[in-house]
């Protein structure tokens, strides 16, 4: 293992260096050149236990000794140097090594300060001056032993893997953390070393990780979760995760969870206002549904996967938002009803279920134009009401506990009645807007197929009207005039993928209109101004002259010849805006947005299409609809 050091002659010292700068200026350590490289054919690599034993054998080869200079001093004298801005740059600064060490003479009152100066180098003048000034001891040679524990996962793998792999593909240390589980997605080139990689990662995150898994290529075709292989640690796949002020628990083997979508979850959660109704068609374990319910939204959440449904129900219960069938009306706003059925069936079912339940309407007095401000005030008011109600309940409980003695009961009743604060009105006494009988938001978060499920909305109100009565439904639709938080038409938020590198918005809207069975020339079709294509599109267009592989998917696109000459972002957007003008007369459907979520692959992006479902779709004649 080598240590790169600096001295005053190197110009590394800075009289103004702070502790923060010192921490950021860690000195690089590397594995000794003597560490044996693996070939991938070692028998121990074929099993989890074998890889663990091999790693234990290899750890000793990472050990190396270094002779550096140090300063001997008493414990009381430490602040004289550790707070000296001129000395700080010369203190030894490497990961996992304290620059304050016990003195080798064994005196418990003595310490040494390790210096970032090799024994063979001259002692910096500023250090010598400090030693003379404070009458300290200069130790010309101190042997420092560094090893496996002082290196990162990257450095260890760089030393162990074949140079042909390291130079071409780097090292596989990137992973996602889900609770106590590290989730890797290893390339095939690392397959012979997968168990070793798992044990190295586990050894570097002791106390945080207990399980390391690798995602396999196979995917469950019905429920869309990946098979995985245990690489290291415990076979414990039940993860506990905190997100959006909620706690989640689930078996990672049988459900889908992506911690990288946290920001997207919160973005949509914030679109749901208190007392609105949200129907989550593909809810999974509840990353949208549970936090939304906790923030005061009425939620109906569904997932076809029985394991997801089980976790969804449990997570709603853990976070105290579960509404069970047959239970009394909740004593607070917001709650979650969980179901397990097909997504298309759920769309129709949820509309009827909301109508039957008639969720509590929004309390009056929070109807200002600044929705965010009013919603925050409403949530604060609800929290205050719950706290005061809880205080009253505790006082009443104390009375009941004291009923064993007349004297104790009388005293408790007296304490309860004297200077008792006014208790907020109960749920039934709060003046409210009418009951919520319609869904305000639908969320469909299964990007591989969610767009296909939009056909479930065709004729949905026509179907509902045959059950509840058309006139009653029409009257309910007019309530938005009294309560601005009511959507006259439901907002649909559908996640999807697009592989169109040039016009992703047009690609998404074309598929959405087809699923909704909206004719291409219909005035109510979904339309939107073009959005910026992925950044790699422009980079690829510039590289195409070299026939680079990164741009091959561009040149194979059917519209490549139309856009290949547009290398700059400005020229490209001008061109597609002109196409939009000719195609849609530059019309953009009101309340429609297409939000970029993340890159899934160089030629595959995830988006969220949000739009208000056209009334022509909801009231379509189902007898002539393509919906099945």
From Swiss-Prot:
Q: Which GO terms describe its molecular function?
A: tRNA (guanine(37)-N1)-methyltransferase activity; tRNA methyltransferase activity
EC number from the UniProt entry: 2.1.1.228
Task: List cellular component terms (GO).
Answer: cytoplasm; mitochondrial matrix; nucleus
What highest taxon heads this organism's lineage? Eukaryota
Key words of the record:
Cytoplasm, Methyltransferase, Mitochondrion, Nucleus, S-adenosyl-L-methionine, Transferase, tRNA processing
Give the family, as the similarity comment puts it: Belongs to the class I-like SAM-binding methyltransferase superfamily. TRM5/TYW2 family.
Name of the protein in question: tRNA (guanine(37)-N(1))-methyltransferase
By which gene is this protein encoded? Answer: TRM5
């Amino acid at each position: 293992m080598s240590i790169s050091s600096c001295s005053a002659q190197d110009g590394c010292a800075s009289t103004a260096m702070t502790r923060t700068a010192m921490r950021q200026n860690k000195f690089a350590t590397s594995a000794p050149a003597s560490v044996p490289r693996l070939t991938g054919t070692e028998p121990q690599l074929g099993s989890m236990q074998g890889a663990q034993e091999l790693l234990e054998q290899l750890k000793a080869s990472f050990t190396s000794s270094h002779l550096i200079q140090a300063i001997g001093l008493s414990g009381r004298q430490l602040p004289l140097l550790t707070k000296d801005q001129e000395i700080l740059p010369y203190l030894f600064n490497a990961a996992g090594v304290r620059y304050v060490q016990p003195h080798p003479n064994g005196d418990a009152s003595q310490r040494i300060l390790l210096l970032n100066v090799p024994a063979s180098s001259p002692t910096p003048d500023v250090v010598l001056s400090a030693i003379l000034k404070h009458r300290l001891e200069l130790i010309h040679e101190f042997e420092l032993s560094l090893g496996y524990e002082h290196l990162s996962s990257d450095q260890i793998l760089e030393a162990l893997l074949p140079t042909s792999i390291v130079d071409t593909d780097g090292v596989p240390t990137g992973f996602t953390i889900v609770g106590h589980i590290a989730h890797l997605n290893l390339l095939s080139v690392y397959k012979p070393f997968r168990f070793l990689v798992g044990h190295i990662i586990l050894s570097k995150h002791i106390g945080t990780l207990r399980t390391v898994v690798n995602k396999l290529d196979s995917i469950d075709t019905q429920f869309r979760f990946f098979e995985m292989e245990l690489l290291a640690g415990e076979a414990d796949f039940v993860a506990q995760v905190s997100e959006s002020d909620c706690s989640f628990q689930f078996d990672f083997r049988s459900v889908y969870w992506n911690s990288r979508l946290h920001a997207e979850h919160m973005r949509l959660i914030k679109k749901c206002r208190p007392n609105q109704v949200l129907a989550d068609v593909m809810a999974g374990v509840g990353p949208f549904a549970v936090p939304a319910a906790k923030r005061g939204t009425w939620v109906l959440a569904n997932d076809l996967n029985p394991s997801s449904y089980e976790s969804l129900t449990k997570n709603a219960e853990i976070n105290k938002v579960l509404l069970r069938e047959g239970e009394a009306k909740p004593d607070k706003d917001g709650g979650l009803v969980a179901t397990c059925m097909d997504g298309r069936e759920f769309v129709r079912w949820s509309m009827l279920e909301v109508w039957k339940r008639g969720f509590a309407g929004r309390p009056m007095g929070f109807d200002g134009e600044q929705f965010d401000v009013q919603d925050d005030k409403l949530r604060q008011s609800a929290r205050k009401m719950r706290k005061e109600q809880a205080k009253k309940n505790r006082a009443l409980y104390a009375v009941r506990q004291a009923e064993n003695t007349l004297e104790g009961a009388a005293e408790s009743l007296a304490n309860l009645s004297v200077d008792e604060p006014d208790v907020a009105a109960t749920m039934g006494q709060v003046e409210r807007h009418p009951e919520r009988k319609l869904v305000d938001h639908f969320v469909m978060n299964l990007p591989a197929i969610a767009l296909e499920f939009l056909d479930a909305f065709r004729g949905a109100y026509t179907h509902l009207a045959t059950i509840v009565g058309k006139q009653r439904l029409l009257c309910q639709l007019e309530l938005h005039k009294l309560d601005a938080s009511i959507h006259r038409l439901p907002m649909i938020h559908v996640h999807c993928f697009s592989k169109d590198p040039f016009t992703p918005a047009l690609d998404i809207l074309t598929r959405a209109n087809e699923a909704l069975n909206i004719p291409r020339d219909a005035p109510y079709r979904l339309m939107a101004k073009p959005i910026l294509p992925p950044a790699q599109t422009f980079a690829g267009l510039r590289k195409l002259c070299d026939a680079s592989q990164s741009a091959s998917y561009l040149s194979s696109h059917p519209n490549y010849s139309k856009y290949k000459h547009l290398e700059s972002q400005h020229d490209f957007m001008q061109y597609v805006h002109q196409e939009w003008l000719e195609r849609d007369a530059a019309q953009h459907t009101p309340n429609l947005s297409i939000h970029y979520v993340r890159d899934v692959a160089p030629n595959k992006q995830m988006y969220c299409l949000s739009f208000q479902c056209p009334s022509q779709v909801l009231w379509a004649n189902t007898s002539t609809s393509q919906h099945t």
